[in-house]
């Protein structure tokens, strides 16, 4: 934590001191500028990217590792750092709308979240939006137009581009083969990095020449992450060292789940008017995170109408979730919802197919037909509730 952050903490301390000072600082979907415990991985990525410092492109690459290993945090921090450092040194890309100003050209770096750029159109739009100074239209143009615009942006001065496409291989998202196909028309000017979870040996596609593994965190690294985040986002001494160790041991190398448990514990403590996180707060925070857990980043990247359905779902008592029909009826009656019962039911089935919720088959049928399916969220509901409400301007 830097000096300014320390001073702000002192300013906020006092009679009305809050337990949670900054929800973003402890959020499992927020990334920090300097990822904790990932120095060796950053060095591997810098070794891979070494050709860019002489103006060349590296080979295409696959960065992989299990959930919660900090892949997104590392790649976003690295790309932000490269853009910042290279811009200060005067090495910038030239485009059709940006004046040439550098004698030594290096590739531009673009990060794309596959959760938000699932189609060809969305991917090209995300890249062009970062690459060009001019506004890229979202409507009234087709995918072919954007593909042509990307070729034109890269062609005039033999410009080069390194694109990282994150969260590849998730349900409804792009695959590695999709990324390769989408950049094939400009493969002489683009090096792509695909970031995903699937081990290379389990992929049934031709793999890029470079593969970089991001292993699960060790317990001591998770403790450091939790301590750092708590230092930035919570009141002083709100989280004890033994509590950090308990979360880290439970999370088994998964920083997403560890931070979700911390967030849930802090939120529970706030609701109970505790000045520090108590053992019952910690227990509630841990119990709120299913194992395995759907990433909250996936949930919060869903379209707003589906998020509203989930927000209504997490408020339902268990008796209203005993079947898809009963859950649908209860959701439709929520003041948050202005959708028809048919639309809500379709959303519930789609969310179940995507692994966001689960339809749990009941054992008893009473001898009549198929047993009903209880609807259970597959994500940390307390954390989602708070993050969703904060996004909507609610407290």
Task: Give each language-model segment a name.
Residues 1-57, 81-84:
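A short, basic N-terminal segment
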Residues 329-395:
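Terminal-proximal interaction/regulatory segments of ATP-powered molecular machines
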Residues 209-228:
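Alpha-helical sensor/transducer elements of the RecA-like P-loop NTPase core
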Residues 76, 80, 259-263:
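The feature captures the helix immediately C-terminal to the Walker
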Residues 319-331:
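Short acidic, hydrophobic short linear motifs in intrinsically disordered regions
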Residues 272-314:
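Conserved alpha/beta core segments of nucleic-acid transaction machinery
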Residues 57-77:
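Walker A/P-loop nucleotide-binding motif
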Residues 94-106, 116-178, 182-195, 199-206, ...:
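Mid-core helix/loop region of P-loop NTP-binding domains shared across ATPases and GTPases
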């Amino acid at each position: 934590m830097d000096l300014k952050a320390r001073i702000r903490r002192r300013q906020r301390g006092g009679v009305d001191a809050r337990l949670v000072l900054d929800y973003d600082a402890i959020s499992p979907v927020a990334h920090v500028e300097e990822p904790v415990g990932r120095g060796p991985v950053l060095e591997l990525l810098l070794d891979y990217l070494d050709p860019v410092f002489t103006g060349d492109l590296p080979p295409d690459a696959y960065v992989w590792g299990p959930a919660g290993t900090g892949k997104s945090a590392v790649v976003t921090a690295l790309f932000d750092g490269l853009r910042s450092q290279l811009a200060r040194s005067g090495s910038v890309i030239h485009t059709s709308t940006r004046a040439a100003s550098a004698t030594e050209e290096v590739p531009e770096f673009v990060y794309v979240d596959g959760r938000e750029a699932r189609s060809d159109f969305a991917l090209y739009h995300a890249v062009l939006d970062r690459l060009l100074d001019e506004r890229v239209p979202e409507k009234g143009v087709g995918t072919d137009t954007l593909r042509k615009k990307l070729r034109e942006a890269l062609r005039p001065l033999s410009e080069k581009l390194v694109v990282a496409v994150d969260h590849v291989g998730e349900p409804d998202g792009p695959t590695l083969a999709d990324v390769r196909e989408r950049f094939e028309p400009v493969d002489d000017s683009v090096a792509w990095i695909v970031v995903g979870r699937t081990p290379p040996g389990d992929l049934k596609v031709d793999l890029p020449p470079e593969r970089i593994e991001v292993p699960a965190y060790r317990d001591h690294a998770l403790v450091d992450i939790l301590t750092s985040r708590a230092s930035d986002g919570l009141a002083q001494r709100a989280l004890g060292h033994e509590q950090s160790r308990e979360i880290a041991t439970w999370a088994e190398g998964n920083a997403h789940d560890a931070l979700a448990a911390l967030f849930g514990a802090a939120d529970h403590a706030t609701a109970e008017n505790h000045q520090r996180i108590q053992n019952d707060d910690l227990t509630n925070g841990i119990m709120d995170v299913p194992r395995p857990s759907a990433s909250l980043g996936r949930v919060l990247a869903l379209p707003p109408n589906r998020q509203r359905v989930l927000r209504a779902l997490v408020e339902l008592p268990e008796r209203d979730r005993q079947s898809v029909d009963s859950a649908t009826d209860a959701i439709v009656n929520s003041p948050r919802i202005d959708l028809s019962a048919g639309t809500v039911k379709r959303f519930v089935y789609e969310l179940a197919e995507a692994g966001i919720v689960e339809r749990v088959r009941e054992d008893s049928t009473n001898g009549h037909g198929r047993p009903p399916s209880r609807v259970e969220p597959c994500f940390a509901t307390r954390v989602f509730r708070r993050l969703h409400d904060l996004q909507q301007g609610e407290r």
